[in-house]
Amino acid sequence: MAVDVDEAWTVPPGTQTFTIERSLPTQIERLTIVGAEGGWELVDLIVGQRRLLPEGPILVRGAGGQVKLQPHFGIDKSNPLEMVVRNPGSEDMHLVVSTRSRALTS
């Protein structure tokens, strides 16, 4: 059964790393990142030693700008998703990260 989870973060000016982890092995099927303010940058997505943005950073313009990915990767407690975000502005920025995931059963 797929589960949708929304997490909200405040991103101060500069580059920040946020971590999404799950206690049980989980397959991420969809990842949507929405910025309340425009002009932010998704610098990288990393799971374990694997970088998920081989073409480099994604610049998101305009308020409400979003990044939608369907990466189909697994995460767990020892291999969380690290999301590197850059806020080039001078004030805090708000992001909402929505994931659709499915628990992996053995």
Say what each PLM segment does:
Residues 1-106:
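Beta-strand-centric surfaces of beta-sandwich/beta-rich domains
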